[in-house]
Amino acid sequence: MASKQLKLVIITGMSGAGKTVAMQSLEDLGYFCVDNLPPSLLPKFWELMKESDKMDKIALVMDLRGREFFDSIEPALDELDNTNFITTKILFLEADDKVLVSRYKETRRHHPLEPNGSVLDGINAERELLSDLKGRSQLVINTSNMAPRELRERINNEFQTEDKDVFNVQLMSFGFKYGIPIDADLVFDVRFLPNPHYIDKMRPLTGLDEDVYEYVMKWPETMAFLDKLVDLLMFTLPFYKREGKTQLVIAIGCTGGQHRSVALTEYVGKAIQQKYETTISHRDMKRRKER
């Protein structure tokens, strides 16, 4: 059994209030997420999870979609409250009736409690059924005036751990001849810089080697570009983080991904990691050229 304290977040609340956004936000924070787990299975599920050393943060979405099981949620929560190795927090999401009706109309969905009737009747019934659960929730968020980005930001502020910056910058060098990385958010082309490939002694080396690095960096256009690129990133990264992104992939490419892109990725990485959690990788550096 895992020796450390385990964290459980139960996401519940009104249909249309943002539970999916909340679950996705917690998933980005490293929580193992399960949607629509019947409450009666909660104690058994937790018995399985506590045996895993890799899962110490769990988020479960529980709502009235499984209405026939929902009556068992109170005793299930009582049982968890009596378990000393679990810290349970209930997150309840709600919104005003007018806002919920508007959201249902926008998505053209039926309310789960009134699939063939009035959306407002379904909302009223759901609000009444969830009143006791709302009363025992540690955190209640009204999303009426929140955009999804704002809800993600609120979730991040509430649940991010103090020892981890939830915004990670991934810097990657690559070669255009092998294709642009499909997961890149930002792509920068540095093929305009002088190419060490055409210098015989540097051809078998990479941008990690001192001779190549110094060669790439000695050109005025290199340093001018790097100054502008670092300034651009330092300006834009806080706004990407504000939008709720927890990861940003920045790809820097040259022809083969061996020299220029590697050197510049190392330089930019050292600048960015002074303020942000940063990982550096070189996708194509070890590739062998086909003869």
From Swiss-Prot:
This is Nucleotide-binding protein lin2617. Pfam families: PapZ_C (PF22740), RapZ-like_N (PF03668). ATP binds at residues 13-20. NCBIfam families: PRK05416.1 (NF003828). Displays ATPase and GTPase activities. Belongs to the RapZ-like family. It comes from the Bacteria. The keyword Membrane does not apply. SUPFAM superfamilies: P-loop containing nucleoside triphosphate hydrolases. GTP binds at residues 63-66. Keywords: ATP-binding, GTP-binding, Nucleotide-binding. HAMAP family: RapZ_like.
